[in-house]
């Protein structure tokens, strides 16, 4: 039962934003597990779950090594795009993003870490990022995602 419960905990923190032990216990109960807060606390410790800062002074549980790729990475990219995207243009399967001087490499790194399936890579200079998209038909969708991030 413990192994199944802990597997479910890992699944829950991968798929949802769980901020408290109480939320995790409620989610487990909804999945049919009988748990107490003390049991959840022990499981969190045994699974080495960590708390990751979210937006608006919140934090959520995640497994070590996984969080920045998911929500934390998307939050970081959103902040960088909102603050630094000066211009965006595309042609075929290439997107050019302009940033203020010195900010392109940080944003390119954030783009790489969110692992959007349509983006196969980035190349960054001082103030310009080349984003390579596959298939080329996905380019307008990727541009739109960047514009949505820029709007907040």
UniProtKB/Swiss-Prot annotation:
Gene Ontology cellular component annotations, sorted alphabetically: cytoplasm
Main localization (coarse): cytoplasm
Pathway annotation from the record: Amino-acid biosynthesis; L-arginine biosynthesis [regulation]
Pfam families: Arg_repressor, Arg_repressor_C
GO molecular-function term, one example from the UniProt record: DNA-binding transcription factor activity
Regions that span the bilayer: none
Key words, A-Z: Amino-acid biosynthesis, Arginine biosynthesis, Cytoplasm, DNA-binding, Repressor, Transcription, Transcription regulation
Keyword DNA-binding included in the entry's annotation: yes
Ribosomal protein is among the record's keywords: no
Signal sequence bounds: none
Localization terms from the record: Cytoplasm
GO BP: L-arginine biosynthetic process; protein complex oligomerization; regulation of arginine biosynthetic process
InterPro entries in alphabetical order: Arg_repress (IPR001669), Arg_repress_C (IPR020899), Arg_repress_C_sf (IPR036251), Arg_repress_DNA-bd (IPR020900), WH-like_DNA-bd_sf (IPR036388), WH_DNA-bd_sf (IPR036390)
Function description: Regulates arginine biosynthesis genes.
Family statement: Belongs to the ArgR family.
Designated name of the protein: Arginine repressor
Organism from which the protein derives: Desulforamulus reducens (strain ATCC BAA-1160 / DSM 100696 / MI-1) (Desulfotomaculum reducens)
Lineage: Bacteria, Bacillati, Bacillota, Clostridia, Eubacteriales
């Amino acid at each position: 039962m413990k192994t199944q419960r802990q597997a479910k905990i890992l699944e829950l923190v991968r798929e949802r934003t769980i901020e408290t032990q109480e939320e995790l216990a409620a989610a487990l109960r909804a999945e049919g597990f009988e748990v107490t807060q003390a049991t959840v606390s022990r499981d969190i410790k045994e699974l080495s779950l960590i708390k990751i800062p979210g937006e608006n002074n919140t934090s959520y549980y995640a497994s070590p090594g996984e969080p920045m790729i998911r929500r934390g990475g998307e939050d970081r990219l959103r902040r960088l795009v909102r603050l630094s995207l000066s211009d965006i243009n595309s042609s075929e399967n290439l997107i050019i993003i302009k940033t203020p001087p010195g900010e392109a490499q940080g944003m390119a790194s954030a783009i790489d870490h969110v692992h959007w399936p349509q983006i196969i890579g980035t190349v960054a200079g001082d103030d310009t990022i080349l984003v390579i998209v596959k298939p080329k038909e996905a380019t307008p969708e990727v541009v739109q995602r960047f514009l949505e991030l820029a709007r907040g």
